[in-house]
Structure formats: structure tokens, C-alpha cells
């Protein structure tokens, strides 16, 4: 996977966390930058670890499906992207409608884990491709840190307007990356 695809994947994977952070920021009255950074760090670390776990699980099965790797990555990314789009359109969310005014550590960890399950599944798909999983996981984690921190800070202003659109955009990006993987296999 080239650098631009890695960056697109990283920011595509961060959109769930961004949407969740907007929701979190929307429930806080004038959140401090330190709260935004704390949230970003929690989301970023978890989002870095989950693709590594998924990659490890995928490697266990790689000898059985190497000839199908492009299809596996494509199907996983289209499924995850489609799910994000459907959730964005329907208005479903991992976030509770009446989120607390103060966000405790375990609430943030639980939310971060819930939004990072997609990254774990992507990690499984990446096990079948020739990618640097550490570089990709770090890119996903850094993008998630940035987007989650930003989401908290602007959440109270744009939460009602952009929250679900961020999930839709993330889903479109994932489907695009899956299509690019499949196209690259057949084109070259």
C-alpha cells in the first residue's frame, strides 16, 4: 500500500472516533484543550493497537487464503465502509444520547474500543497484503489522535450538523480504498 493509501486509510479509520469525539465534545461545556488531548490520546492508543491485534489474527490464517487476499481486503473494507454509511444515514450511534457532562477514563476507553473494532477488522485484511503493519497502525493512531482531539474541541459547535456526515465520509473512504486494492490487483 502506498503512502497516500495509508494516509487515506488512517483518516478513514479515524472517522468513527471523530464522530464519537464530536458527540463527546457536544456534551461538555467549553471543553479544555487538556480534555481534548486526553481523549485524543486514549482514542489514538487504542486505535493503534487494534489493527495490530487484527493483523496478528489475520496472519494466523494467511497460509490458507493468500490467493484471495485482495478479495478479503476488498470485502472487509466495503463491508465496514457500508456499515459506517448506513449508521450515518440511519442516525445510529455507539454514543448514548444522554452522554454525561464529564467523561471518565473508562467511559472514554469503552467508547474508543467500540469505535476501533473496524480498525481491528481492517488489520485482519491487511495481514493478507504486503504492508508495514506498524507504520499503518501508527498512521491510524496518529490520525485518530488528531481527529479525536479536534472532534472534542469543535463538537459543541458542529456536532448536530456534521457528526453523522463524518461517519458517511469515513465509509466512502474505506470503500474507495477497498476498490483501489482490488483495482491494483487486477490492473498490475
UniProtKB/Swiss-Prot annotation:
InterPro entries: Mntp/YtaF, Put_MntP
Transmembrane segments: 3-23, 41-61, 62-82, 107-129, 143-163, 168-188
One term of GO molecular function: manganese ion transmembrane transporter activity
Entry membrane topology: Multi-pass membrane protein
UniProt KW keywords: Cell inner membrane, Cell membrane, Ion transport, Manganese, Membrane, Transmembrane, Transmembrane helix, Transport
Compartments where located: Cell inner membrane
Pfam families with a match to the protein in the record: Mntp
Main subcellular location: membrane
GO cellular component: plasma membrane
Family: Belongs to the MntP (TC 9.B.29) family.
Function: Probably functions as a manganese efflux pump.
Protein's name in the database: Putative manganese efflux pump MntP
Species whose genome carries this gene: Klebsiella pneumoniae (strain 342)
Amino acid at each position: 500500500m502506498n503512502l497516500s493509501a495509508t494516509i487515506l486509510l488512517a483518516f478513514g479509520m479515524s472517522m468513527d472516533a471523530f464522530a464519537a469525539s464530536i458527540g463527546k465534545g457536544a456534551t461538555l461545556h467549553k471543553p479544555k484543550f487538556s480534555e481534548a488531548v486526553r481523549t485524543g490520546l486514549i482514542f489514538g492508543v487504542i486505535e493503534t493497537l487494534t489493527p495490530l491485534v487484527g493483523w496478528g489474527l489475520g496472519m494466523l490464517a494467511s497460509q490458507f487464503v493468500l490467493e484471495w487476499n485482495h478479495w478479503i481486503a476488498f470485502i472487509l473494507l466495503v463491508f465496514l465502509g457500508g456499515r459506517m454509511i448506513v449508521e450515518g444515514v440511519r442516525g445510529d450511534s455507539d454514543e448514548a444520547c444522554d452522554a454525561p457532562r464529564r467523561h471518565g477514563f473508562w467511559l472514554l476507553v469503552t467508547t474508543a474500543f467500540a469505535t476501533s473494532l473496524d480498525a481491528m477488522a481492517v488489520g485482519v485484511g491487511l495481514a493478507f497484503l504486503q504492508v508495514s503493519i506498524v507504520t499503518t497502525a501508527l498512521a491510524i493512531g496518529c490520525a485518530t489522535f488528531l481527529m479525536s482531539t479536534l472532534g472534542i474541541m469543535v463538537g459543541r459547535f458542529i456536532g448536530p450538523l456534521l457528526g453523522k456526515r463524518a461517519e458517511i465520509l469515513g465509509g466512502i473512504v474505506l470503500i474507495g480504498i477497498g476498490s483501489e486494492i482490488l483495482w491494483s490487483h487486477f490492473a498490475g
